[in-house]
């Protein structure tokens, strides 16, 4: 269906040699599960954390599938409580280094 195909258009995988970055946009956990079941992703070096660190995004299934080394959360002052403590705990439990635009400002990622 059109709605189902839209689910897969919300993610971007950027690769340069062995360096891979995954951007999942505002996907929720259920959609992330469908995504990892549909595609064989490489290990991810940098993951742009979904939905500004919402408790409903960047779930354990995704994290176990793509094993990211670094998580970047694009977030500013907001009334939603993003990123949530639950999301931050999932990221650190997955062994990721986490960077946040509300704490570090602009984040520059370079690849040699």
Residue ranges and their predicted role:
Residues 1-8:
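Short, small-residue-biased leader/transition segments that mark boundaries at the very start
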Residues 2, 110-111:
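Conserved GTPase G-domain signal focused on the G5
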Residues 10-14, 107-109:
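Short beta-strand scaffold segments in enzyme catalytic cores
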Residues 15-21:
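Beta-strand-turn-beta hairpins that frame and shape the catalytic cleft
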Residues 21-23, 49:
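Residue-level marker for buried hydrophobic side chains located in beta-strands
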Residues 26:
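Gly/Thr-rich phosphate-binding loop signature of adenosyl cofactor/nucleotide-binding cores
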Residues 33-106:
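Cap/insert and terminal regions of metallo-dependent hydrolase folds
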């Amino acid at each position: 269906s059109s709605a189902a195909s839209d689910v897969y258009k919300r993610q971007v995988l950027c690769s340069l040699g062995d360096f891979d970055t995954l951007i999942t946009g505002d996907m929720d956990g259920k959609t992330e599960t469908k995504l990892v079941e549909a595609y064989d992703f490489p290990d991810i070096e940098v993951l742009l954390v979904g939905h500004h660190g919402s408790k409903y995004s960047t779930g354990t299934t995704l994290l176990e599938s793509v094993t990211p080394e670094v998580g970047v959360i694009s977030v500013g002052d907001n009334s939603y409580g993003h990123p949530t403590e639950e999301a931050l705990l999932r990221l650190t439990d997955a062994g990721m280094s986490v960077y946040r635009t509300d704490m570090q400002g602009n984040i520059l990622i370079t690849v040699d």
